[in-house]
Amino acid sequence: MINTQTLARPYAKAAFEFASAAGQTDSWSKMLNLAAVAVEVPEVAALLNDPRLTSESKVQALVRVLGDDADEAFRNYVQTLGENDRLSVLPTVWELYEDIKAQAEKTLEAEVETAFELSNAQLQTLAAALSKRLDRTVNLQQVVNPALIGGVLIRAGDVVVDGSVRGKLSQLAESLKS
């Protein structure tokens, strides 16, 4: 079976190229998110997977669900997805679209896990250091996890920096085992 990312990638790229050219990347992000959420609703998913319905009727049903939140260009995009039997990959299209958008805007969502809550000044300092290291604007989301004991664990895209006491203790335990 073909990977959904393989199916969704060209649609995500096309959506981003169109939205970028029209200066509507944020509104397309919202519309794609809405459509992605809609196709995951069990009732809508059942309707879209019903083999008795034509692709046109499936598209019309999804467009009705989206209502006025989808502009004409987006409805045409949904029509294209429907004609190619790709409505079910909308959640993956949205995820890939967001990745492409973040790359184009040179932004990166990062999670910083700490044992204790950091102050705004500490978060800003950390975000600035990460932005410099990764050459991107970093948006930090803080998660407090007392199990870390101390230090920080940072996840930014493919980069993971484990500066936690728990991580250091795990490394020490591994080195003692060998």
From Swiss-Prot:
Where can this protein be found?
Answer: Cell inner membrane
Keywords (A to Z) from UniProt: ATP synthesis, Cell inner membrane, Cell membrane, CF(1), Hydrogen ion transport, Ion transport, Membrane, Transport
InterPro entries in alphabetical order: ATP_synth_OSCP/delta_N_sf, ATPase_OSCP/d_CS, ATPase_OSCP/dsu
Task: Give GO MF terms, alphabetically.
Answer: proton-transporting ATP synthase activity, rotational mechanism
Lipid bilayer topology: Peripheral membrane protein
Instruction: Kindly state one GO CC term assigned in the UniProt record.
Output: proton-transporting ATP synthase complex
* UniProt KW Cell inner membrane keyword: yes
NCBIfam families assigned to the protein according to its UniProt record, in alphabetical order = ATP_synt_delta, PRK05758.2-2
What is this protein for, i.e. what is its function? F(1)F(0) ATP synthase produces ATP from ADP in the presence of a proton or sodium gradient. F-type ATPases consist of two structural domains, F(1) containing the extramembraneous catalytic core and F(0) containing the membrane proton channel, linked together by a central stalk and a peripheral stalk. During catalysis, ATP synthesis in the catalytic domain of F(1) is coupled via a rotary mechanism of the central stalk subunits to proton translocation.
* Protein family according to the UniProt entry: Belongs to the ATPase delta chain family.
> Quaternary structure per UniProt?
F-type ATPases have 2 components, F(1) - the catalytic core - and F(0) - the membrane proton channel. F(1) has five subunits: alpha(3), beta(3), gamma(1), delta(1), epsilon(1). F(0) has three main subunits: a(1), b(2) and c(10-14). The alpha and beta chains form an alternating ring which encloses part of the gamma chain. F(1) is attached to F(0) by a central stalk formed by the gamma and epsilon chains, while a peripheral stalk is formed by the delta and b chains.
Q: What is this protein called?
A: ATP synthase subunit delta
The organism encoding this protein is: Stutzerimonas stutzeri (strain A1501)
